[in-house]
Amino acid sequence: MLSCLKEEMPPQELTRRLATVITHVDEIMQQEVRPLMAVEIIEQLHRQFAILSGGRGEDGAPIITFPEFSGFKHIPDEDFLNVMTYLTSIPSVEAASIGFIVVIDRRRDKWSSVKASLTRIAVAFPGNLQLIFILRPSRFIQRTFTDIGIKYYRNEFKTKVPIIMVNSVSDLHGYIDKSQLTRELGGTLEYRHGQWVNHRTAIENFALTLKTTAQMLQTFGSCLATAELPRSMLSTEDLLMSHTRQRDKLQDELKLLGKQGTTLLSCIQEPATKCPNSKLNLNQLENVTTMERLLVQLDETEKAFSHFWSEHHLKLNQCLQLQHFEHDFCKAKLALDNLLEEQAEFTGIGDSVMHVEQILKEHKKLEEKSQEPLEKAQLLALVGDQLIQSHHYAADAIRPRCVELRHLCDDFINGNKKKWDILGKSLEFHRQLDKVSQWCEAGIYLLASQAVDKCQSREGVDIALNDIATFLGTVKEYPLLSPKEFYNEFELLLTLDAKAKAQKVLQRLDDVQEIFHKRQVSLMKLAAKQTRPVQPVAPHPESSPKWVSSKTSQPSTSVPLARPLRTSEEPYTETELNSRGKEDDETKFEVKSEEIFESHHERGNPELEQQARLGDLSPRRRIIRDLLETEEIYIKEIKSIIDGYITPMDFIWLKHLIPDVLQNNKDFLFGNIRELYEFHNRTFLKELEKCAENPELLAHCFLKRKEDLQIYFKYHKNLPRARAIWQECQDCAYFGVCQRQLDHNLPLFKYLKGPSQRLIKYQMLLKGLLDFESPEDMEIDPGELGGSAKDGPKRTKDSAFSTELQQALAVIEDLIKSCELAVDLAAVTECPDDIGKLGKLLLHGPFSVWTIHKDRYKMKDLIRFKPSQRQIYLFERGIVFCKIRMEPGDQGLSPHYSFKKTMKLMTLSIRQLGRGSHRKFEIASRNGLEKYILQAASKEIRDCWFSEISKLLMEQQNNIKDQGNPQFEMSTSKGSGAGSGPWIKNMERATTSKEDPASSTGGIKGCSSREFSSMDTFEDCEGAEDMEKESSALSLAGLFQSDDSHETCSSKSAFLERGESSQGEKEERDEEETATRSTEEERAGASTGRLAPAGATAGFQARALRPRTSAQES
């Protein structure tokens, strides 16, 4: 690029010429001897206590006159000094060097004024004094005092300047010619002080403007001369237009300045122009000379800048011509760079025959695609050579471009030749490896098909041995190279990965051959023991268990070598069989299976032994074991998403399957799933493994990682956006390819909901540990041994382990609640940013709401008002009302919420209503002017909400009372006949529902607490899975429910509007009519909204869907 190339024309010439102009302006205006300007002392000059009339003495000395001024002695010293300094700096240096003649007119003044004038002149006159003429005071007494004073002080003034006392102007004319004196002194010199001040001010302003303009042109020229040349034609055109506009602006200023100077010069010469007989005084002549010299400097400034601009404009035009080459060069280089980048993406030699063949096809396409860019690049290099030969100013910049183009072309052509050779070798390399792998897989499947129960007879053994011998004979059909020959032929291709793969394949060949040998030995031994009865111990291969790693599974008597198949009930299974780690496990497990095959008659059934060992474990250790096993499966599932969906997005041969919207939003689709994987794989799993032998560390593990687990909140905060992207892109071919490659039966988004299910699993396991503590941590009441199992053992109150478990459970439940809140609030539009200040979300659900304003309506008119349907959220410190809208989506109508208002609890009161309102309660503002009547779907929901709000209000009231400043009141219905009775009753009922599992499950549906756990849940590992499904169905909604979470329950549909209008009052009327019809439907037994009672380990909110509830009850 030419961005680093500076314009070659130096600005020294322009800078030098303009600097000369500035210096000349300073000399003309005598800037060195005139520190002040007229505009700075304009007020002092207008007072006219001293003037420079323009008169001269006989020897040309300038005359400064001090006219009669009554307040002369009151003039500040600074003002006097400034005026004297300015007046003495105006005459030329030659005239000032002669000396100034001072004429002091004090004919009407006193001796004191004469003395003050002489004293100030003697002390503060900045110029060279030649003579002082004093016109004596005309009155006799003052003249006498003046004569005496002059005689007395003459010696003092004599040493500094000659003083001549004159009695009248006629005496003064004997010393100074009348033509050099103003009319006040009896002369004929025309002097107008206001005009003189205006001329001086205008001349100085003109000189200052000229100087400033010259400096501005200097700066502008430097900027233009040092500016970097642009990199494109459009940029060059823009730069040229910009510079031209700036130049035109400066040129206009120069022209305007020239007109101003010409006008000022005309004004100064006006007296002589109007009256040819009149002559200009010396001051006026000096002003004319000054303006003429300044105009000459202005003309010089214009010439210097015009010359510079012509060269700069020519340079920009040449640059614009250069940009044609630069533009073509950029396009050609970009095309070559893209070709080289695509070529560089083929650095891999392929990891399979299909991959290599695909690379060869793409490489051929790339070669065909490169023909046109190569021709253009070579032609452009020839154009560059022509520019160099034409002595272009940027020849040094063009020459490297031509060289670069030719080098890029040569690099690409040579790289293609080298690629063809390497890929040809790689294709043969992988074909050889595939031959070995195919033979090994065929052998493995042969071994897997030889079931144990078929080898119980001599005939079955002979058939198996014959099959093995036949298969080993087929090795002649595969011209396999020896390892030494293999490495010698493909030595250049053996990178670390290729070498590792070759070693694995060849090692697998050795392992399979060894397995065949052992199988033959085993079958021969088994044939010799046919007299002993053999009990079959393994099913057929088609019903054998799925492949699991030897780290997490017990040895089996079968040989599960086939690729595992997933079912919809098992979202967490092993991923691929083609990884090297699993191939090693496969061969090792095969060897181990031979030993089991050989000795299974001499020991009992291993599955029964495994069950016996599990039966020996305590419930606590079984739960820890379940936690570890599911944790490993969870990590592997996340890893499969990363390796199977995220990583392949960068594969060039799959890019055509990925739509742009998915490519641009892949980070939002997967969120921070990599962060989840790193945390669980590197940190959390290792800490959980330490709990296998010491379960007491489990709770501490969760508490220790409380902050790290907040990554789940970040994940779920992004989940709604991920769902939207998935719904838009779920049908693209890329997901289908990845799903088939991973052998997943479920789509991707089912696995993306795995973190949500994992949090539920943690919650259930922690609840299970609380219900199944070891005997040393329990106290069993002997009288309860015959009771129901659901009552469970009593926990020791001082058990530290139990306390930590409860704290850990609270951490997980709070995390689930915060995650669900993040998703729920994502559906609320126009939600304020400070909603987090209201604290934790406790309850939320749909309600019918009546609004009453006391100053507008009466209670007796209540029946005329129809309810509005609102989604209400109860937080620790406030209530949020949201409007419900049903909007069409991909799966039909779905609810959407819009924020309406927020009410702080500390400003509210609550009361129950009278008879006939068993589903309603009222909340009101503290002043009672604004009231809301809320109708729930059932009495149980009403009681739960009323109890929870009452509890929060009482807590806040107690806190305020402790501070001595109550801020709210609570009232009860007059019809109830009790003061706080309904509060206490509802609170007791809510407390009972939390503590009694039977009453909880049979009472308020949707309140998530620990009653859904029972001792029967954790009798075995399968029970934990059943409990997870049950808890998920009963406790979670929206975020944690199944993939059809966009569907809503029937009760919720009854609350939602079918089509809201945004037309003001009509919208509300339609909404209320719909709500009235919906209210009738709710009485049929609609399910509740999401409820989450607060407590020490408060659960998260839940939506109790009717189908799932019935399933749980069954």
Swiss-Prot record:
Compositionally biased spans, kind Polar residues: 546-559, 962-975
Spans of repeat Spectrin: 323-428
Stretches assigned to the CRAL-TRIO domain: 11-193
GO cellular component: cytoplasm; cytosol
Tissue: Significantly expressed in brain and modestly in pancreas, brain and testis.
Ranges for domain PH: 834-954
TM spans (from-to): none
Basic and acidic residues bias locations: 577-606, 986-997, 1043-1067, 1074-1084
Gene Ontology MF annotations: guanyl-nucleotide exchange factor activity
Effect of L1039F: In a breast cancer sample; somatic mutation
All copies of domain DH, residue ranges: 619-822
The keyword rRNA processing is assigned to this record: no
Keywords assigned: Diabetes mellitus, Guanine-nucleotide releasing factor
Acidic residues composition bias: residue spans: 1017-1028
Segments of this protein annotated with the region Disordered: 530-614, 962-1114
Record-linked Pfam families: CRAL_TRIO_2, RhoGEF, SOS1_NGEF_PH, Spectrin_5
Disease: Type 2 diabetes mellitus: A multifactorial disorder of glucose homeostasis caused by a lack of sensitivity to insulin. Affected individuals usually have an obese body habitus and manifestations of a metabolic syndrome characterized by diabetes, insulin resistance, hypertension and hypertriglyceridemia. The disease results in long-term complications that affect the eyes, kidneys, nerves, and blood vessels.
Function, as annotated: Probably functions as a guanine nucleotide exchange factor.
Family of the protein in this entry: Belongs to the MCF2 family.
Record protein name field: Probable guanine nucleotide exchange factor MCF2L2
Species per Swiss-Prot/TrEMBL record: Homo sapiens (Human)
